[in-house]
């Protein structure tokens, strides 16, 4: 061992931020194990790596006793005082026991420790970088596929895209560039493990934040997202700025903003509606593109009964109940849809308005992607 090791550790500390002292302490600990494994397993030893020269020495540590029972661990008071007259019973004497051929073992051990610590440090850097990217999107390149995952390169690391996080309307092949949403970053013994998604509602949210400057700067707030990936989604938006149309901001000039997101999601339809703190208005908006005649609210059950024109019933419910299902997810309210005819037969429509009540509904403002 020589000063070359110390020079190498100094470079590592500067370039990779790995503490030189921590590596030296790790080397010393590893050399203790190496000494015991190769020379004397039972002996209590200390290894000293000289911080200036790089030389390594091994010291046996022995307790000073009146009567010796184990020469590997103990030394008599007489022998100890022969080394130094001030030693007393209970003290610890260190005697150098560095083997002649220990240099080869030390060099090999040091190399292994440094390699391991560098690998751990690099994994730590990657983990720190990606843990801050949770709930964010990145562009990756498909590397390979199997029956469980698509393996996506994110540059420094390969992420896993599970089957249940893949969009049903997409097919993937190596070298495809795709945007993915980072759902989880885990520490494992083999390094950071990153899981990504193409179906998570957060992907849609982040795409709007990227495409719509008013959302990015906070002028428009994206309040909620409901998504059935690859088929249809709904988002609700609001603003405190009376001069800004939140729905129009998301649609963009000639529909360019929302169309860019639809293209990224391979044709997924997107409804954009105005959010409201009033559940009557919000639920009516959320059922877009259907026209709504009335919304009856049950606050205790957090449930609503929605009356729509007979000819709009199928549109309000949607194919396989999708429109109603997405509206319920978007608003957080249960939604039971009834036709005008059924509502009249049940006696729940029309309701009598109080003197101060305004007309129940005008057409809700909404936007739907063209795809």
Swiss-Prot record:
Protein name in UniProt: Transcription termination/antitermination protein NusA
The UniProt record lists the keyword Transcription: yes
Localization per Swiss-Prot or TrEMBL: Cytoplasm
One BP term from GO: transcription antitermination
Record domain S1 motif: where: 135-199
Subunit note: Monomer. Binds directly to the core enzyme of the DNA-dependent RNA polymerase and to nascent RNA.
Cellular component terms (Gene Ontology): cytosol
Lineage, opening ranks: Bacteria, Bacillati, Bacillota, Bacilli, Bacillales
Region of interest (Disordered), residue spans: 347-371
UniProt source species: Bacillus subtilis (strain 168)
Residue stretches of biased makeup (Acidic residues): 353-371
A Pfam entry, by short name: NusA_N
SMART domains: KH, S1
Gene Ontology molecular function terms on file: DNA-binding transcription factor activity; RNA binding
Start and end residues of each KH domain: 301-367
Function: Participates in both transcription termination and antitermination.
Protein keywords: Cytoplasm, RNA-binding, Transcription, Transcription antitermination, Transcription regulation, Transcription termination
Main location class: cytoplasm
Family per record: Belongs to the NusA family.
